Amino acid sequence: MQTGSGVYHAEELPAGTEMFQIWFEPHLARAVKEAPTYHQYDHEQFPVEEADGVRIKHVIGPQAPIRLVTDAEMADIEIAAGQSWTYSLPDGYALAAVVVSGRGTAWPQRQADGGAADNAPLETGDFTVVTTNGTESVVFQAEPGESLRLVAIRVPAEVEYPLYRK
């Protein structure tokens, strides 16, 4: 849903559906001039990659059917027990992740000096944000014997337009 100058709302959720809402702040002066839009997507419409015990469903971004007026990418990631997923975070961006289910760890791998920070434990319901001072990779590792599912969102750490007043 992109609200623009108003809102269209029409969810119909079948039994067993899980969802959460995320609001991205566009350039408000431009966004209010746009007509509101609403689209319903089915699971099969999202491209999925699978390799080395990691399944990535692209939700928002260049590989996904959902494109926004804001600079954002979003993926639903499932990491098999004991496996890891590494994401290269460009300079000037932040990666936010919410753990949907499971347990594991996350840590940044700094590419500039080759060092690594301590592992941060993660479990269902946890939310973490990683920002960079240069290109860096973030590693998410599932616990042995338990898979880890998270939703990861990449956005600019700062934008060059005014945000909503808090």
Per-region residue spans from a language model:
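Jelly-roll (double-stranded beta-helix
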Residues: 1-166
